[in-house]
Swiss-Prot record:
Position of the signal peptide: none
Gene3D superfamilies: Amidase signature (AS) domain
MF annotations from Gene Ontology: ATP binding; glutaminyl-tRNA synthase (glutamine-hydrolyzing) activity
NCBIfam families documented for this protein: gatA
Lineage: superkingdom: Bacteria
Record gene name: gatA
Name of this protein: Glutamyl-tRNA(Gln) amidotransferase subunit A
Record's keyword terms, sorted: ATP-binding, Ligase, Nucleotide-binding, Protein biosynthesis
Example of a GO biological process term: translation
Record-annotated active site: 78 (charge relay system), 153 (charge relay system), 177 (acyl-ester intermediate)
Catalytic activity from the UniProt record: L-glutamyl-tRNA(Gln) + L-glutamine + ATP + H2O = L-glutaminyl-tRNA(Gln) + L-glutamate + ADP + phosphate + H(+)
Keyword Cell membrane set for record: no
Length: 485
């Protein structure tokens, strides 16, 4: 039995009782990585020397009264979250040798909580992708079946947790990039409310959509991690000055009287039968615990995919303009003038999907097209946000599938961008509205691949999401299933 089969609270108790050491936890992580990483390929960079030194330092503090619940816990960090002195590449050749000189705010907070960073996790390049096949280095595989994708863009973050390489991880979510891989890999992933968690130190893809969030084995562990990384940060102008409640207090298993909305659009066209049936079964479980549910409509969600790709690509076009060979990242040697430097550096440094989105965004922002595309997309975004607010006026949470289907095979959709984009049709509206949502395991589909239940909440009401997710988790055993890697 792996130490990582235990929850954070159980491991914390074992540490305090000196049944295990922090070094034991770190070695457990690196041993598992040595055993499975050649197949899973979840990590891009390991930090073994520093992790072992930190573990030895923390071992001397075991039993101290001020040790928090995350004391000594091994974590993996998505490779678009900067880590001081530890290579951060965004899975792009553009940043292949970039060593940051500061820590992201979330990393600072986790260091203050005495977690130990095991390494940096693979992803789709600059977080653009839904399968991890867009990594500039190599594709991560799904621990449940190595022939299948782990999802993206936080595929490495989800796969590492599912494979037992780390206890938990950090990912980022712009259009579903935490929740979708969490669903595909049978783990728990939460996208917080926009502004709940600081984005300082997150390499920007689409600044109005990006959020950092936790990926874990259980809902309780997820709540611990969000508690640690949430809160106002003066270094991030979009960070919200909203009180962070006690997320653990609501994990009672009680959902009696809870009002659940189920959008008909989330169970309709484009959603597979396996995903639909798993959600209906989950609703029966919650109904049996005293919750009620009704069908509702989010009428503008059908426009979410087009809206998202116009807006996110436009923001990406602006954000990635800084990578030009002058200051950040690689620099092409094949140059005769400044124009060559810009063109050749970006042509050589960026992958195909990143180039595709930069082109789309530049087009949408160009003279003559701004009003026709970008401005109208912003107006539709407002309508989508209003749809959610209208539903939340009468309901506590919205529930549906996280993804239309279970994970697909490696290489199956890589040559068809539109089919690939459609994997995120159920997660994208949440980012456009800025509301929080979690994916929890809710069953299995074809070839024993996991399915996820998406629970969406009101702005800054992560507590209710956790309450529902925890109650469902405790009433089922999906979270106890493990990939037999």
């Amino acid at each position: 039995m792996s130490l990582f089969d235990h929850s954070v609270s159980e491991l914390h108790k074992k540490l305090n009782n000196k049944e295990i050491s922090v070094t034991d936890l770190v070695e457990e992580s690196y041993k598992r990585i040595a055993d499975v990483e050649d197949n899973v390929k979840a990590f891009l960079t390991l930090d073994e020397e520093n992790a072992r030194a930190k573990a030895k330092e923390l071992d001397a503090k075991i039993g101290a009264e001020d040790n928090g619940l995350l004391f000594g816990m091994p974590i993996g960090v998505k490779d678009n979250i900067v880590t001081n002195g530890l290579r951060t590449t965004c899975a792009s050749k553009m940043l292949a040798n970039f060593d940051p000189i500061y820590d992201a705010t979330v990393v600072q907070k986790l260091k203050a909580a005495d977690t130990i960073t095991i390494g940096k996790l693979n992803m789709d390049e600059f977080a653009m992708g839904s399968s991890n096949e867009n990594s500039g280095f190599y594709a991560t595989k799904n621990p449940w079946n190595l022939d299948y994708v782990p999802g993206g863009s936080s595929g490495g973050s989800a796969a590492a947790v599912a494979a037992g390489e780390v206890l938990f991880s950090l990912g980022s979510d712009t259009g579903g990039s935490i929740r979708q891989p969490a669903a595909y890999c049978g783990v728990v992933g939460l996208k917080p409310t926009y502004g709940r968690v600081s984005r300082y130190g997150l390499v920007a893809f689409a600044s109005s959509l990006d959020q950092i969030g936790p990926i874990t084995r259980t809902v309780e562990d997820n709540a611990y991690l969000l508690q640690a990384i949430s809160g106002l940060d003066r270094m991030d102008a979009t960070s919200a000055n909203v009180e962070v409640g006690n997320y653990l207090a609501g994990l009672t298993g009680d959902v009696k009287g809870l009002r659940i909305a189920v959008p008909k659009e989330y169970l309709g066209e484009g959603v597979g039968e396996e995903a639909r049936e798993s959600v209906l079964a989950a609703l029966k479980v919650l109904e049996g615990m005293g919750a009620t549910w009704e069908e509702v409509s989010l009428p503008h969600s059908k426009y979410a995919l087009a809206t998202y790709y116009l807006l996110s690509s436009s923001e990406a076009s602006a954000n990635l303009s800084r990578f030009d060979g002058v200051r950040y990242g690689v620099r092409s040697d094949n140059v005769n003038n400044l124009l060559d430097l810009y063109k050749n550096t970006r042509s050589e440094g960026f992958g195909d999907e990143v180039k595709r989105r930069i082109m789309l965004g530049t087009f949408a922002l160009s003279s003559g097209y701004y009003d026709a595309y970008y401005k109208k997309a912003q107006q539709v975004r407002t309508l989508i946000k209003n749809d959610f607010e209208n539903v939340f006026a009468n309901y506590d949470v919205i529930i549906g599938p996280t993804t239309p289907t279970p994970a697909f095979k490696v290489g199956e959709k890589v040559d068809d961008p539109m089919t690939m984009y459609a994997n995120d049709i159920l997660t994208i509206p949440v980012n456009l509205a800025g509301v929080p949502a979690i994916s929890v395991p809710c069953g299995f589909g074809a070839n024993n691949m996991p399915l996820g239940l998406q629970i969406i909440g009101k702005h800054f009401d992560e507590a209710t999401i956790y309450r529902v997710a925890h109650a469902f988790e405790q009433a089922t055993d999906y979270h106890t299933k493990k990939a037999s890697l």
